[in-house]
Amino acid sequence: MRHVLFNRFYQPGIDPVTRAPVPQLRYSDASELLLRLYWIAILAGRVRPSLALSGGAHEPLDAVNALMAGADVVQLVSALLKDGPGRLTAIRDGFTRWGDEHGFASVGEMRGCVSLSNCHHPEGFERAGYVNVLQSGRFPATPWAGH
């Protein structure tokens, strides 16, 4: 059995003139990936069912990160809907190339290597990791901060 975390809910808009729901489809984007990676990494190896990462994966490195966190499968629905089925070949080839370049003999060797259970720096998943980021001053650029 596979469990999909953070599967997207259908979110219709509202037309105030007709007072009716308006169907709309929003693709996932990269900003949605981090929360999913975080929870996959925490749950991998701690729950029995397989874990599927859903939402935010669009690039080969996104799939690498998902597998390293502990996902068994990575859903690429938005990437395929936006770019067509040929995108799957590009992601697969990039994923394979990255694994080869970094010495992974198999997907199984990669899977879960950075999960909370297997990570050499588990504090990165804990509150202390957040405090360290705040203390480091590594913040995204903002227009008002002169970046």
Residue ranges and their predicted role:
Residues 1-49, 83:
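Glycine/Thr-rich beta-alpha phosphate-binding loop at enzyme active sites
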Residues 2-11, 56-57, 62-90, 134:
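Glycine-rich phosphate-binding active-site loops on the catalytic face of alpha/beta enzymes
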Residues 12-29, 67, 81-104:
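C-terminal helical cap(s) of enzyme catalytic domains, especially alpha/beta-barrels
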Residues 32-62, 125-147:
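Active-site/ligand-binding-proximal alpha/beta "capping" segment
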Residues 38-41, 45, 74, 89, ...:
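Feature representing long, continuous alpha-helical segments
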Residues 52, 75-76, 108-109:
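Conserved active-site loop/cleft motifs that coordinate metal ions or position small ligands
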Residues 83-88, 92-98, 102, 109-147:
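C-terminal extensions of enzymes
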